[in-house]
Amino acid sequence: MTDGHDVVNPEGLPHPSGFNHAVVSAGGRTVWLAGQTALDHHGVLVGGGDVVVQFDQALRNLLTVLGAAGGHPEHLVSMTVYIVDLDDYRAHAGEIGQVWRRLVGTDYPAMAAIGVARLWDADALVEVQGIAVLPA
């Protein structure tokens, strides 16, 4: 990238096309994490119509990218969750919260949940995107 920004595209995730999984700013330690869906490392969507399984995989993917950039879950400062079916997501909020606590703990960044008509992958139910600030 220009201006010395570093891109992060870790092994274990599908090779990105038209985006990077993360960008680390050259002037600081801010990491912008690209949206992640429930794709496995072969680029196959997992979880079928199960929003909890898809959230679990999408969050795991985001945390994989964050780790490859040198960060940890507690470095997340903002996260946006894009959801195809808000009613289904809310109906499973308790289970989704359990996934969060298992993978991240009880640190919560600033968050927004946004309902969308569909995601890039037509079968994806949820996508997570984040920003992290790493210690200097």
Residue ranges and their predicted role:
Residues 1-60, 64-77, 83-136:
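N-terminal presequence-like segments and the immediate start of the first folded domain
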